[in-house]
Regions:
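Second-shell loop/turn segments in exported
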Residues: 52-63, 89, 108-110, 151
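Acidic/histidine-rich, surface-exposed loop or edge segments in extracytoplasmic proteins
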Residues: 43-59, 100-105
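Histidine-anchored nucleotide/phosphate-binding helix
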Residues: 63-82
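N-terminal signal peptide c-region/cleavage motif recognized by signal peptidases
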Residues: 13-15
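Acidic helix-start/capping segments at beta-turn-to-alpha-helix junctions
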Residues: 83-101
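Positively charged n-region of N-terminal signal peptides that target proteins for export
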Residues: 1-4
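N-terminal targeting signals for Sec/Tat export/insertion, comprising classic cleavable signal peptides
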Residues: 27-48
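A cross-taxonomic marker for long C-terminal extensions/tails that follow the last structured domain
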Residues: 20-27, 104-108, 113-173
Length: 173
């Protein structure tokens, strides 16, 4: 019996590792390895109300990790056949991550290159993700309103976004 269970475990593990990385919803970002042979899957009949607090400037695959995490979640939900109408995603951006909100022109002026997050920000917005930036962080970093990506909305504070949406039933990711 032990050999049988060990054999099944090895076969299952090989099946998972052989699968390709995919990005079914947010093309090119938030790669996932999807498998139907796992115990817990996103449930297509649930309403997914998710909120992300993005404060770190840490990068993953060339973009801010928090944005990549949102893409990852949308790709997992999409691969599991959860309809877009069942998914609502919001993010609160503040702290060291605030610079991700800059337009390409403003980012170029400040860092000498185009904003590597712009394409992902645009894809997330096209897929209904609401991206809010803390106006306190914007003021602290002396960012002009004209330098903010048009897909980013200013909020009084990151804390107000987090509180309001969690009180509306959003789950913090």
């Amino acid at each position: 019996m032990k050999k049988y269970i060990l054999s099944l475990t090895i076969i299952y593990s090989l099946n998972l590792s052989a699968q390709q990385w995919i990005t079914p919803v947010i093309d090119g970002y938030g790669e996932i390895k999807y498998s139907q042979q796992v115990a817990v899957q996103p449930e297509a009949d649930l309403d997914y109300k998710l909120i992300y607090k993005i404060t770190s400037s840490e990068e993953r695959n060339g973009v801010i990790r928090g944005l990549n995490s949102i893409a990852h979640s949308l790709n997992m939900l999409g691969a599991a056949k959860v309809r877009a109408t069942k998914i609502q995603v919001v993010s609160s951006i503040s702290g060291p991550a605030t610079s991700l909100i800059l337009t390409d022109e403003a980012y170029q002026k400040k860092y000498g290159k185009k904003n590597p997050n712009t394409a992902l920000i645009n894809l997330l917005a096209e897929n209904g993700v609401k991206l809010y930036v803390c106006s306190q962080a914007v003021a602290y970093k002396k960012i002009k309103a004209s330098d903010i990506n048009p897909n980013i909305t200013s909020a009084l504070s990151g804390a107000s976004v987090m509180a309001n949406y969690q009180l509306k039933g959003y789950v913090r990711m």
